[in-house]
Amino acid sequence: MPAGEAEARAVQDTLRSRVVLDEPGPPPGTGRVTGVDVAYDDERDVVVAAAVVLDGATFEVVAETTAVGRVTFPYVPGLLAFREIPTVLAALESLPVDPGLVICDGYGRAHPRRFGLASHLGVLTGLPVIGVAKNPFTFSYEQPGPRRGDWSPLLDGEEEVGRALRTQDGVKPVFVSVGHRTGLDNACAHTLLLARDFRQPETTRRADSLCRKALREAAA
């Protein structure tokens, strides 16, 4: 774990060169898809991570696991991965099956140093990973059209770092970015398929519910 902010940024800059951006990634509706998410108990400096593996075609749960860890890095925007990565890795490593494509509640390329949680996790595991976030972080975008599937580029200046994707008619968009070993078109296609009933992908919804439940149990 980095000793401070400067060291953490140096780690990001070093690992960023290992991100693979020229693979399309697994096709939607096939294989397995895994949602990862975390929940915090700030008073006790505890973080709980959950990983939920779904069948990519049926959305049935194939496997799920949780891990409990200590928060050992301060809250610094742009460096949140260092608070989450150790516990998320522990959850993924305890899965009894290959996770397939991993979906993070966060960012990949849509990050000031182009190395958010989804990219960090992808480089460390070698897995294809995408980020699907609830807000645009520091980036700009125009509202996509009102219909499900409409999208607009998420921009840092003139560089497209992700997309604002409307997953439900008339509902706020989510913000999709590539993490590792997956293209942006494919990342959006996966997100849209997984968000068939709600704004958030089913993977994220399941992982969020599981980590919150595990945090309550850990605090009991």
Task: Describe each PLM feature range.
Residues 102, 138, 142-143:
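Feature detects long, helix-prone N-terminal segments enriched in hydrophobes
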Residues 128-133:
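Short hydrophobic alpha-helical runs that function as membrane-insertion/retention elements
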Residues 107-108, 134-137:
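Short, ordered loop/turn segments at secondary-structure junctions
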Residues 74-79, 104-112, 171-178:
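Flexible, glycine/proline-enriched loop segments at strand-loop-helix junctions
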Residues 31-41:
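Two-metal-ion RNase H-like nuclease active-site motif
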Residues 88-121, 125-127:
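Catalytic-site beta-strand/loop segments enriched in glycine and acidic/polar residues
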Residues 43-98:
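A glycine-rich, hydrophobic loop/mini-helix early in the fold
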Residues 1-22, 85, 134-135, 143-220:
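C-terminal binding/interaction regions
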